[in-house]
Swiss-Prot record:
Keywords: ANK repeat, Apoptosis, Coiled coil, Cytoplasm, Methylation, Mitochondrion, Phosphoprotein, Repeat, Transcription, Transcription regulation. Expressed by podocytes in kidney glomeruli (at protein level). This is KN motif and ankyrin repeat domain-containing protein 2. The gene is Kank2. It comes from the Eukaryota. Gene3D superfamilies: Ankyrin repeat-containing domain (1.25.40.20). One of its GO terms (biological process) is negative regulation of actin filament polymerization. Residues 187-207, 284-311 form a coiled coil. It is found in: Cytoplasm; Mitochondrion.
Length: 847
């Protein structure tokens, strides 16, 4: 049963008013809030606000005032509704039996203040009028007795709570009867409505929070729009196209119309399309297809190139002899003239029955000697030799010089049988004093005469000057030796081989004769005749590798012949020497790298960075492999140095002093390995930097303290090294000198050599130590005596700790050395300086 509560006290804020029950003729105050069955009180403005939100009329927020619990209701006078149906939802008719409705507006003081400030709120007035009208209608309607009839609430007909009919109101005569308990469905419906209203309110609050962020974004976008507009106007003013287009954009740029009112204005329109819609192939696929086409073209070009090379080789079958033949063609040109020496170029080897032809059609005497071998050749090597031979003449004013270039092929066994074919016919040359061989006379008499005259030298001023130079010359010393061939009753073959020509290429001059040519052999073995002079390339600046060497101009060969005047005499070797059989093979990579470096040294901009790096790496690896090993051969090093000098003097300087990643040069490695023959070859080049420091801060002179001197040649080599460099140089690490290092390692021979080169014995390192202190500390008595024998040796020097050499010896327990120092200090005897260096080898020989 719904219980109607009548309170006689007036509603707060409206004093003097009584309840509607006390004044039946007076209209009751309009209700302004409603209490829910579970203790909450809802404001009518809030309900109206929720209803407006559902209908989408407004987004304004209406403040919601939450009422305290039922126990905290004010006790003052007020107007109470007589039914729980007031201002409740029409769909929840059962809720009117479970709660009280407090409808006085004076309960919320803020509303009174609001009315006082801004007057009457129209929305509140409409709500109140609506509620008052409904109350009047319900009061005028006939009321039925019973507990189920309740006075309808004014708020039950609001637009926000509709949908379900009202239950019969409670009669007014019921008084304070007990209200009917609300049903569960009514409560659930109210809860759902409240939850929905709260959810909508939360969503609206979140949207309100986003308003400042959106306003900031809007301002940023407006600023960007303004900047883009300004930029667009400036670009249009300057005549530049606006913006950048992507790769797939199709843009039509139409020229602007002139300032003519009769012509319509046009504008540029950009249309976005896709590449596949336009039929344009994909960029990556197009590149792949293009690469495939280029690869196909490259393969075809390579095939054509190979075919052309094959045809070129087929068109020149006579450039070299067939594989199963053995041919040697010698071309000799003799020129008479007092001023310069002209040398004929060599012809290539031809077929066995082919006549040899000279490269120069004038003044050439040709001698062709072709032999055929019965057995098959396994290996053949092409060799080129250039020899300079002075020729006898009737007049002493003119000198005839012939340059003989021999191209030979030999088998690996060296025992091929060779027959005597008839010599090739040749026309006698007016400039040649030697008759050519006649075709009808195959006897070797003419050949013997020519060979004898060619190999018999005549003493000249150049040869005398070379003999006077002796071993001081840097020229190539080539040995002339004879190859012994097993005796054969039919043919006797003799080979004269020159070793050391053209940077290490062996050269041979073969003469085939019968057993009757004893006169030719005896002529070559005569004692009064001096040995044959050989062409040198030690100082020749025009030397090139084997391929370009054949067929050079006469001017280049003339320069080579002029440089050959410095060559000393050749020595006749009684037998084969393993050192003479060493061959120098210059790889094509090394040759090309040397030529590239030569270009770079002449013009630093001639090579790219990659080409320079490749050339530098190749030369460095080949040179270090050749000269920096412990078993490096001095002859190979010398021949490479000759080749580098022939290419360029700058190239020689660059290669000799090239260093690895640790700063070590070939001289550093050679001295460390005690390979003094290679050290001498490097020093003889004249471009070796003997004072160059490595990354550790040591020079080659300092590294001699680690080497062991075995022979007198080793001592002479280090003496040459010391004289070329600075023996007083200090290491960058501790400031030690070569003398200090030699004393510390106990190298007596090196100490003697340094003293012979007038080294400063009083130099101090970073700690203030001298060589004498080092000898005293390590207990080297002999070295101490050598140092004390130097008159300039100062034994009173102190180190950083204030210790003298005597104190160092006493601290080390070297009593004998301390006695020597004490005697030197007291007696002050002076020893004679070392005027001459005496080597251990010579001293042992005297004993």
């Amino acid at each position: 049963m719904a219980q109607v509560l009548h309170v006689p006290a007036p509603f707060p804020g409206t004093p003097g008013q009584a309840s509607s029950a006390a004044f039946p003729n007076k209209e009751p105050d309009p209700p302004y809030s409603v209490e829910t069955p579970y203790g909450y009180r809802l404001d009518l403005d809030f309900l109206k606000y929720v209803d407006d939100i559902e209908k989408g009329h407004t987004l304004r927020r209406v403040p919601v005032q939450r009422r305290p619990r039922l126990g905290s209701l004010p006790r003052g006078p007020g107007s109470w509704w007589t039914s729980t149906e007031s201002l409740c939802s029409d769909a929840s008719g059962d809720s009117r039996h479970s709660a009280y409705s407090y409808c006085g507006r004076g309960f919320y003081p803020q509303y009174g203040a609001l009315e006082t400030r801004s007057g009457t709120n129209p929305r509140v007035e409409r709500t109140l009028l609506d509620a008052r009208r409904r109350l009047e209608d319900q009061a005028a309607a006939p009321s039925s007795g019973g507990l189920g009839s309740l006075t309808p609430s004014a708020a039950g007909s609001t637009s926000s709570l509709a949908g379900v009919g009202l239950l019969p109101p409670t009669p007014r005569s019921s008084g304070l009867s007990t209200p009917v308990a609300p049903s569960a469905g009514h409560l659930a419906h109210v809860r759902e409505q409240m939850a929905g209203a709260l959810r909508k309110l939360r969503q609206l609050e979140e949207q309100v929070k986003l308003i400042p962020v959106l306003q900031v974004k809007l301002s940023v976008l407006q600023e960007e729009k303004r900047q883009l507009t300004v930029q667009l106007k400036s670009q249009k003013f300057l005549g530049h196209p606006s913006g950048t287009r992507s790769r797939s954009e199709l843009c039509l740029d139409l020229p602007e119309a002139p300032d003519d009112p009769a012509v319509l204005e046009t504008r540029s329109v950009g249309t976005w399309v896709r590449e596949r819609d336009l039929g344009i192939p994909d960029g990556e696929a197009a590149l792949v297809a293009k690469v495939a086409v280029l690869e196909t073209q490259l393969k075809k070009a390579l095939q054509e190139l190979r075919a052309a090379q094959t045809q070129q080789v087929d068109l020149q079958p006579q450039a070299w002899p067939p594989p199963d033949t053995q041919v040697r063609v010698d071309t000799v040109r003799v020129v008479e003239g007092p001023r310069e020496v002209e040398v004929a170029a060599s012809t290539a080897a031809g077929a066995p029955a082919q006549r040899a032809q000279s490269l120069e059609p004038y003044g050439a005497g040709l001698k062709a000697l072709a032999t055929s071998a019965e057995n098959t050749l396994v290996f053949r090597s092409h060799e080129v030799v250039e020899t300079m031979c002075p020729l006898p003449t009737a007049s002493t004013s003119n000198m005839h010089t012939a340059k003989k270039i021999s191209i030979t092929e030999r088998n690996c066994t060296g025992a091929a049988r060779m027959a005597d074919p008839p010599p090739s016919p040749a026309e006698p040359s007016p400039s040649s004093p030697y008759p050519a061989a006649e075709p009808e006379n195959p006897a070797p008499a003419a050949q013997d005469t020519t060979d004898r005259e060619l190999t018999r030298p005549v003493a000249s001023q150049d040869s005398q000057a070379a003999e006077g130079a002796g071993g001081a010359s840097l020229g190539v010393q080539s040995a002339l030796k004879r190859k012994e061939v097993p005796a054969d009753p039919d043919v006797h073959q003799r080979n004269l081989q020159f070793v050391g020509i053209n940077g290490g290429y062996e050269s041979s001059s073969e003469d085939s004769s019968t057993a009757e040519n004893s006169e030719h052999e005896s002529t070559e073995n005569e004692a009064p005749e001096p040995p044959v002079r050989v062409l040198s390339t030690a100082e020749g600046p025009q030397l090139r590798p084997l391929g370009p060497a054949v067929g050079k101009t006469s001017q280049d060969e003339r320069q080579l012949s002029q440089e050959s005047q410095r060559v000393p005499e050749a020595k006749v070797a009684p037998g084969p020497d393993p050192e003479e059989e060493i061959r120098m093979d210059l790889s094509p990579d090394l040759i090309s790298a040397c030529l590239a470096l030569e270009k770079y040294l002449e013009n630093p901009n001639a090579l790219t960075e990659r080409e320079l790096k490749v050339a530098y790496t190749t030369v460095l690896q080949e040179w270090l492999r050749l000269a920096c090993r412990s078993d490096a051969h001095p002859e190979l090093v010398r021949r490479h140095l000759v080749t580098f000098r022939a290419m360029s003097a700058r190239l020689l300087d660059y290669v000799v002093n090239i260093a690895d990643s640790n700063g070590n040069t070939a001289l550093h490695y050679s001295v460390s390995h005690a390979n003094f023959p290679v050290v001498r070859q490097l020093l003889d080049s004249g471009v070796c930097q003997v004072d160059k420091l490595n990354r550790a801060g040591y020079s080659p002179i300092m590294l001699t303290a680690l080497a062991t001197l075995k022979t007198q040649d080793d001592i002479d080599t280090i003496l040459q090294l010391f004289r070329l460099g600075n023996v007083n140089a200090k290491a960058s690490q501790a400031g030690q000198t070569a003398l200090m290092l030699a004393v510390s390692h106990g190298r007596v021979d090196v100490v003697k050599a340094l003293l012979a080169c007038e080294v400063d014995v009083n130099m101090q390192d970073e700690d203030g130590s001298t060589a004498l202190m080092c000898a005293c500390e390590h207990g080297h008595k002999e070295i101490t005596g050598l140092l004390l024998a130097v008159p300039s040796c100062d034994i009173s020097l102190t180190d950083r700790d204030g210790s003298t050499a005597l104190m160092v010896a006493l601290d080390a327990g070297q009593s004998e050395i301390a006695s020597m120092l004490y005697s030197r200090m007291n007696i002050k005897c002076s020893f004679a300086p070392m005027s001459d260096y005496e080597s251990p080898a010579s001293s042992s020989a005297e004993e």
